[in-house]
Amino acid sequence: MTILTHTLGFPRVGLRRELKKAQESYWAGNTTREALLAVGRELRARHWEQQKQAGIDLLPVGDFAWYDHVLTTSLLLGNVPARHQNNDGSVDIDTLFRIGRGRAPTGEPAAAAEMTKWFNTNYHYIVPEFSKGQQFRLTWTQLLEEVDEALALGHKIKPVLLGPVTYLWLGKVKGEPFDRLTLLKDILPVYQHVLAELAKRGVEWVQIDEPALVLELPQAWLDAFKPAYDALAGQVKLLLTTYFEGVTPNLDTIIVLPVQGLHVDLIHGKDDVVELHQRLPVDWLLSAGLINGRNVWRADLTEKYAQINAIVGKRALWVASSCSLLHSPIDLSVETRLDTEVKSWFAFALQKCGELALLRDALNSGETAALEEWSVPIQARRHSHRVHNAAVEKRLAAITAQDSQRENPYEVRAEAQRARFKLPAWPTTTIGSFPQTTEIRGLRLDFKKGNLDANNYRTGIAEHIKQAIIEQERLGLDVLVHGEAERNDMVEYFGEHLDGFVFTQNGWVQSYGSRCVKPPVVIGDISRPAPITVEWAKYAQSLTDKPVKGMLTGPVTILCWSFPREDVTRETIAKQIALALRDEVADLEAAGIGIIQIDEPALREGLPLRRSDWDAYLEWGVEAFRINAAVAKDETQIHTHMCYCEFNDIMDSIAALDADVITIETSRSDMELLESFEAFDYPNEIGPGVYDIHSPNVPSVEWIEALLKKAAQRIPAQRLWVNPDCGLKTRGWPETRAALANMVKAAHNLRQAK
């Protein structure tokens, strides 16, 4: 039995972020829809050919998305919220953009659909909305069109489809409450229709993604898989695909399904290959996810060979990435500035395809010399001086319980802070960043390229900070920020100033829609060689009598939004970062900064997928935050910010952070997230986000007032702050001014109504 290679998906955005640029040009009205569609076609053709040339036997089709693959599935099923529909009921690419962004070049603006994290990754999906009695039909044929494209190019393909049970699991009920699982019978005919169309095109295998099968699902959801797949059986071969965790706990549910193969993630799961082989039906194909799709490290192919070789020849076998390569940068070969030694430790998406081809060839032939050669740099890395720092390891080992305790409890600190800041009721602030204009980006780029000297760069940044302070004072905000003009990304900026990180030139990965991030890579022990944010925070504070917040990204978020080391635990990395940033808090405080925000938007997304594993993670995640913050004096107010979060199941841990103020993203969920804080009787101060910064729509004063009044029904008004959902980096100044002016006006109205 010949072993084949395949990937579960490939990065969409293009090596130079061509998709991002085309999307944003289209949204701005600077290019046509036809030009946008042409960019998509060119990228798909290029990516299929690149994977094929790298040694992939079966190419994924349907992994491309104009915004998000879950949103693509919603359109496929005709699941379009009424507020986003075209008047004639048709569906087009602007429908998709209205759901994801709240507006598009055509159609009326409307509130964007909710966005949240894709399992425990840094990718976001648009949450499907379900209503009682909803109807579904095939309305968006993107998958079929892309299959036709790939077949016309002569490729051997494997279409990719998000499975029906996971799709329903990922959604939310809107309006009258009901069990969304009851919609399964209504969406299955659309899936049957799609599979029939694929069969007509001669497709043999379809990858049907059911990552919900790695979760601790309620029994009713587990029971839904059998009737669902009974309905889908018989038209094509189905590769039931899971990732991000192991499947052994749910294997009894899986092995009775009428599918022809199973993909398992052998990186993040703890499944034993031999046990899987013994328990799976004998005629099933096993797709082994042996190459990590979520990190950038070169694989130890000798180890992978040993892991899978025991079942070679005993059943049909494919080798694959653990998950979609969407989460990896595209091509290491274009990284010309990386140190040669460090570069030899990495593999990006195309190199991972090459790793699969090497592994396939070795497993088919029994010859392992090429694998041994590939793995040589991995052995060298284990002993590199770049990896180990004795001083950091010693400091980490010396941490005591006292290092994570503030001097006094919140009630005492709050009195000291009220006396220091004398803020009005409903204090207004922003989350940190202001619009990253063309001028700001150009300034940073010129400096990075050496076209601008340090003095002129600093003068330029200082001017942008000054303008941000002037804008905020003009708007009447109570607590100001410096605007972060000097920062390209909230994680990358800190990584650039901490030892133990390296950076890529083109290591972009998609976060959502057109937003891409370039995560730093943790290659060794982490320390802070010098203050990072103090100079600019101190300068901003010198420009105003109002308090200016110091802005830090928290240790868990830096960990979650970086590519981590694989030779130490995540806890070790987080606590090393916490110790480095603890020194930054002390330096900010010494420089006269009285309010310091430590953002932890990723705290919840870092949760293990299985609830039984949560406690251990939350214990060290909370401890890392507290180590970072606990050096602050009582009169220094510590803020934290979180977004895309469901809080009700981790409220104990949110409270345990002991931040004086927490700002959260609530506008897209209509303040429903505050239910968790109300039920828990959360004791500290809260800033519920009053408008969605991911949409360019400007909220009215009345809209914001209504949200704040709703918030005050749950949280005492004296503990409420007024702020946007998130940072304003991606917005333009006109909409930012308008939205913040309305926000400040709403706060003033509520003060007067007191």
Swiss-Prot record:
Entry binding sites for L-homocysteine: 431-433, 484, 599
GO molecular function, one term: 5-methyltetrahydropteroyltriglutamate-homocysteine S-methyltransferase activity
Cofactor notes: Binds 1 zinc ion per subunit.
Alphabetically ordered keywords of this record: Amino-acid biosynthesis, Metal-binding, Methionine biosynthesis, Methyltransferase, Repeat, Transferase, Zinc
Enzyme class: transferase
Catalytic activity: 5-methyltetrahydropteroyltri-L-glutamate + L-homocysteine = tetrahydropteroyltri-L-glutamate + L-methionine
Keyword presence, Transport: no
UniProt superkingdom: Bacteria
Known EC number: 2.1.1.14
CDD domains according to UniProt: CIMS_C_terminal_like (cd03311), CIMS_N_terminal_like (cd03312)
Binding positions for 5-methyltetrahydropteroyltri-L-glutamate per the UniProt entry: 17-20, 117, 515-516, 561, 605
Active-site residues, Swiss-Prot/TrEMBL: 694
Cofactor: Zn(2+)
InterPro entries in the record: Cbl-indep_Met_Synth_N (IPR013215), Cobalamin-indep_Met_synthase (IPR006276), Met_Synth_C/arc (IPR002629), UROD/MetE-like_sf (IPR038071)
Single Gene Ontology BP annotation: methionine biosynthetic process
Family: Belongs to the vitamin-B12 independent methionine synthase family.
Function of the protein: Catalyzes the transfer of a methyl group from 5-methyltetrahydrofolate to homocysteine resulting in methionine formation.
Database matches in PANTHER family: 5-METHYLTETRAHYDROPTEROYLTRIGLUTAMATE--HOMOCYSTEINE METHYLTRANSFERASE
Protein name: 5-methyltetrahydropteroyltriglutamate--homocysteine methyltransferase
Gene: metE
